[in-house]
Amino acid sequence: MRVLYIHAERFSWESREPALDIRDEPGSGAAANALVVFVSVERGDSSDEEFLRRVARDVVETAEKVKATAVVIYPYAHLSNDLARPYVAKEVVNKLYEVVKSEFKGEVYKAPFGYYKAFEVKCLGHPLAELSRSFKPEEARVAKAVEERRDVYLVLTPDGREHDPAAYSPADPDLKALIDKEVFKRELGGGEPRYLDYLRKFGFEWEPMSDVGHMRYGPEATVMMELVEDYAYQVAKSLGIPVFKIRGTNMFKLSEKAIETHARLFGERLYIVESDTDLILRYAACFQQFAMAKDWVISYRNLPFGMLEIADSYRHEQPGETVVLFRLRRFYMPDLHIFTKDLAEAVEVSYKVHEAIFREIGKLGRTYVSLYNVTEEFYKSHRDYLVELARREGKPILVRILPTQKYYWVLNVEYHIVDELGRPREIATFQIDVGNAQRFGIKYVDENNQVKYPVIIHTAIIGSVERYLYAVFDTIAKAEREGKTPRLPTWLAPVQVRIIPVARDNLKFAMEVADKLEEAGIRVDVDDRDETLSKRIRDAETSWVPYVCVVGSKEEETGTLSVRIRGEGQAKMTAEELIKRVREETRGYPTRPLYLPRLLSQRPTRG
């Protein structure tokens, strides 16, 4: 923060026209014998109380030293080339004004933020009449860190007992890994994960012509992404409540109070876009769904209900922390918000969400260890609720108790798998939000015709689209470490069946079989390339195609296919039997068509 002090015999100001979308109400004023405090808020400054009290003490001491009877806080953007974002600067200036007002015995004024202003000043011209200052928040943060109450961690077992993580010896190695990472901040696992090799064959890769942390998705990756998106909607509907699927924008104005406040509560990693106004790229679907829900007329009879969007989401992760398919600056979130009457109903609905989260990861052959982030007040009043969730998990949970409510939630449950390298990796989540309905103006009318604000559950039951696929590939990596053949779930395989004609004469029959399979909703292609049979079979294996059918004259005559089943061996079956088998393996999952030309000869090869 840069500050210029002017001890003025007279000082007056008047707002003329708006300079920013984020601004105070217009105004004017005047003061005599005033210390005028021209303030430029810089990047890195914050509304941290200790920092602002340090600045305020200097303001008050200077005012008393020059015997000023008034102080004027004047937002002034021309003292620095490294200014904070307007929404940050406005908050810092306004809070500085409040702190100075509480500590200075004379009059304290503030010129409006966000305007072109006219001012007149008559400087008194003594040795202390013009002074400059520079303040850095780091010094205040160090002092505050000593005094600030730290988060408390404990292990809560299904029988309701609490344990100190330092003295607790978990039987579950996954829980131990979570405790080591979260409580003791130990670096876990090392080496190159296998899943990175898998991703290249399916077209999941960084986009070098974009910002750090942005991916591109080839045809195989795209069909897998869209299948997971479809499945996320299917899972949301399985909760047994009405779910409204929507679409919206990814940019929101920071000048909107609700957006600005929610962004501050989210914390760091905001993705800001500079335009003719400051815009924030959404970090989940919250902004759009809440902006839409506030315009709905909602009755208690409508609750609970959900809103789902597959939201392109943006988080400004550090460049060295981005990991393909896991930690990204841009990703796709099947973000479900469930609107409930009150906290009691939110608790009841959360049991369904919790059950669905474990059910879905169980379908991949995995389970979660859970971290429960909770405010101290909520833990004291709802401890039995957390014990019940632990009981439903059937194992101990790690609880982090925050002394104050720093975020928009009172409970945030993170569900972690432990990957092939022994590292906890958060996939799914749910949160209970008691403030955003009022912040955005989302209301409902209860049975007594009273206007109420719903309690909102935020959840990504299967995680982001990318993280769900990360869990799939990590599961395959673990299986391969155990000596098993790597294999995608059949419903997710970009190509479910490949037909390889032995000779050119067999191509017509191969296409007829492919037609039959395609009509049954199976993604099928035909390898008609002028390559040897062994190479084409090898390429199908490299591509992890679950079913590879080699058709020659014998198969044409008998109508029986020679099928290589990935990870199992060879079998003879008719096209109808193959269709039945694929349908059994994909029952309950969405389908999509092939996103590639059927004939491999028509496809460009990767460089």
UniProtKB/Swiss-Prot annotation:
Record EC number: 6.1.1.3
InterPro entries assigned to the protein according to its UniProt record, in alphabetical order: aa-tRNA-synt_IIb (IPR002314), aa-tRNA-synth_II (IPR006195), aa-tRNA-synth_II/BPL/LPL (IPR045864), Anticodon-bd (IPR004154), Anticodon-bd_dom_sf (IPR036621), DTD-like_sf (IPR023509), Thr-tRNA-ligase_IIa (IPR002320), Threonyl-tRNA_syn_edit_dom_arc (IPR015011)
GO terms for cellular component: cytoplasm
Metal-binding among keywords: yes
Catalytic activity: tRNA(Thr) + L-threonine + ATP = L-threonyl-tRNA(Thr) + AMP + diphosphate + H(+)
Binding of Zn(2+), residues: C286, H337, H458
Region (Editing domain): 1-143
Co-factor remark: Binds 1 zinc ion per subunit.
Claim: Cell wall biogenesis/degradation is one of the keywords in the record: no
Biological process according to GO: threonyl-tRNA aminoacylation
Catalytic, as annotated region: 193-489, 194-489
GO molecular function, one term: ATP binding
Keywords annotated in UniProt: Aminoacyl-tRNA synthetase, ATP-binding, Cytoplasm, Ligase, Metal-binding, Nucleotide-binding, Protein biosynthesis, RNA-binding, tRNA-binding, Zinc
Main localization category: cytoplasm
Cofactor names: Zn(2+)
Subcellular location: Cytoplasm
Domain description: The N-terminal domain is an archaea-specific tRNA-editing domain that hydrolyzes incorrectly charged L-seryl-tRNA(Thr). Catalysis of tRNA editing is performed by the charged tRNA itself.
Subunit (UniProt): Homodimer.
Membership in a protein family: Belongs to the class-II aminoacyl-tRNA synthetase family.
Function: Catalyzes the attachment of threonine to tRNA(Thr) in a two-step reaction: L-threonine is first activated by ATP to form Thr-AMP and then transferred to the acceptor end of tRNA(Thr). Also edits incorrectly charged L-seryl-tRNA(Thr).
Protein name (database record): Threonine--tRNA ligase
Taxonomic source organism: Pyrobaculum calidifontis (strain DSM 21063 / JCM 11548 / VA1)
